[in-house]
UniProtKB/Swiss-Prot annotation:
Assembly description: Interacts with DNAJC12.
Lineage: Eukaryota, Metazoa, Chordata, Craniata, Vertebrata
Signal peptide range in chain numbering: none
UniProt protein name: Tryptophan 5-hydroxylase 2
Tissue specificity: Expressed in brain.
Family: Belongs to the biopterin-dependent aromatic amino acid hydroxylase family.
A GO CC term assigned to this protein in UniProt: neuron projection
Name of the coding gene: Tph2
Length: 488
């Protein structure tokens, strides 16, 4: 059983900081003076006077970018000029110069009168190299900072771009495919390709009227696999399958509709599904997981051999993946693999995709002392499901560092399967593994805007902390009420 995705540099750039001379004692004296100067500036603004002078002048916000040698005390000397000219500094950032490796560039957002600013610039010219004056706020844009990083979607609607970059369309069948010589089947596959390629984020997923033969094929797969699930599937799978029968029409005589499944998953775990025309690259497929979006095929395998398919079809997606995507812990595990892939190098994405393959596609877990399957490739393949839980299978403990080196086999049973005690354990191991990924920033999924925020400086991190603080306040309030109720 082939998984839902299988086919397949980023460089470091300088991190931006708030100070280049933070270890110099003289800085603390300067920063103290600057703080005092800012307070004086505020008082003078209230009285309408220009700092240090008797006349009044209109202050306005402006900015300057200058470069200086990366040496101890260099920043202190430059910033002292701002103090001497009574220029109020609102924000400071630093980064390595793109012009000379031995220099750094300083961005200063400030507030002052025109006269003071011109005098400041003249003094700065003697100590620094002026790069630009009064630049736009986005002088150091994220686009510029990420220019050496592989593109990834920053908002959920940009998954349209990922979904349409199909490597192999559903109509391109190999000569050994059961439906290769079936022109009617090939035309049907073309229909599903057109549906998927025409889909855009926010639209309801088109409902498909499956043919009698397609429904019959689905029915055979559903019936035979259902016999194995009680003794082979994990408890999370067994918990959700009856719910899918109740709310999404999982029956032997009915092929479920992706729109119904997507709405069900949204309520259970926050995941949704969207149609896809064929194979995606690992990078594009994993990017969908970062947004809790799973790309699903809608076509059904060829009816001549219902228990075999050389590619992922809707039987694989609906019976293998969906029941576990409805589990919140499994959903979180899936999303974290996706988040780790964003902006990662091709080599790291390959490693993550291999870990995905041997967990979400072919993973095993221990429950009540017994091996159980949670991988979709197993739960949608009768032969391999039996094999993986038999004495003939080679089972190893899941360790991302070694698992990522295991060869992924497509047309035969795997040489090895990997077992975890729980989804939580697998998730923690993947978190530790993700720390080794070469990526000079972290990412945060904002569930309110369904966008990815890049955490690379104190301001971006502060925004996340504010959200966490709000959540913690809610938890603390709930605990206090529980304690009051219990009389603690």
């Amino acid at each position: 059983m082939q998984p839902a995705m299988m086919m397949f540099s980023s460089k470091y750039w300088a991190r931006r900081g708030l100070s280049l001379d933070s270890a110099v004692p003289e800085d603390h004296q300067l920063l103290g003076s600057l703080t005092q100067n800012k307070a004086i500036k505020s008082e003078d603004k209230k009285s309408g006077k220009e700092p240090g002078k008797g006349d009044t002048t209109e202050s306005s916000k402006t900015a300057v970018v200058f470069s200086l040698k990366n040496e101890v005390g260099g920043l202190v000397k430059a910033l002292r000029l701002f103090q001497e000219k009574h220029v109020n500094m609102l924000h400071i950032e630093s980064r390595r110069s793109r012009r000379r490796s031995s220099e750094v560039e300083i961005f200063v957002d400030c507030e002052c009168g025109k006269t003071e600013f011109n005098e400041l610039i003249q003094l700065l010219k003697f100590q620094t190299t002026i790069v630009t004056l009064n630049p736009p706020e986005s002088i150091w844009t994220e686009e510029e900072d990420l220019e050496d990083v592989p593109w990834f979607p920053r908002k959920i609607s940009e998954l349209d771009r990922c979904s349409h970059r199909v490597l192999m369309y559903g109509t391109e069948l190999d000569a050994d495919h059961p439906g290769f010589k079936d022109n009617v089947y090939r035309q049907r596959r073309k229909y599903f390709v057109d549906v998927a390629m025409g889909y855009k984020y926010g639209q309801p997923i088109p409902r498909v009227e499956y043919t009698e033969e397609e429904t019959k094929t689905w029915g055979v797969v559903f019936r035979e696999l259902s016999k194995l699930y009680p003794t082979h599937a994990c408890r999370e799978y067994l918990k959700n399958l009856p719910l899918l029968t109740k709310y999404c029409g999982y029956r032997e005589d009915n092929v479920p509709q992706l729109e119904d499944v997507s709405m069900f998953l949204k309520e259970r775990s926050g995941f949704t599904v969207r149609p896809v025309a064929g194979y995606l690259s690992p990078r594009d497929f994993l990017a969908g997981l970062a947004y809790r979006v799973f790309h699903c095929t809608q076509y059904v395998r060829h009816g001549s051999d219902p228990l075999y398919t050389p590619e992922p079809d809707t039987c694989h997606e609906l019976l293998g993946h969906v029941p576990l995507l409805a589990d919140p812990k499994f959903a979180q595990f899936s999303q974290e693999i996706g988040l780790a892939s964003l902006g990662a190098s091709d080599e790291d994405v390959q490693k993550l995709a291999t870990c995905y393959f041997f967990t979400i596609e072919f993973g095993l877990c221990k429950q009540e002392g017994q091996l159980r399957a949670y991988g979709a490739g197993l739960l949608s393949s009768i032969g391999e499901l039996k094999h993986a839980l038999s004495d003939k299978a080679c089972v190893k403990s899941f360790d991302p560092k070694t698992t990522c080196l295991q060869e992924c086999l497509i047309t035969t049973f795997q040489d090895a399967y990997f077992v975890s005690d729980s989804f939580e354990e697998a998730k923690e191991k993947m978190r530790d593994f993700a720390k080794s990924i070469t990526r000079p920033f972290s990412v945060y999924f904002n569930p309110y805007t369904q966008s990815i925020e890049i955490l690379k400086d104190t301001r971006s991190i502060e925004n996340v902390v504010q959200d966490l603080r709000s959540d913690l306040n809610t938890v603390c309030d709930a605990l206090n009420k529980m304690n009051q109720y219990l009389g603690i």
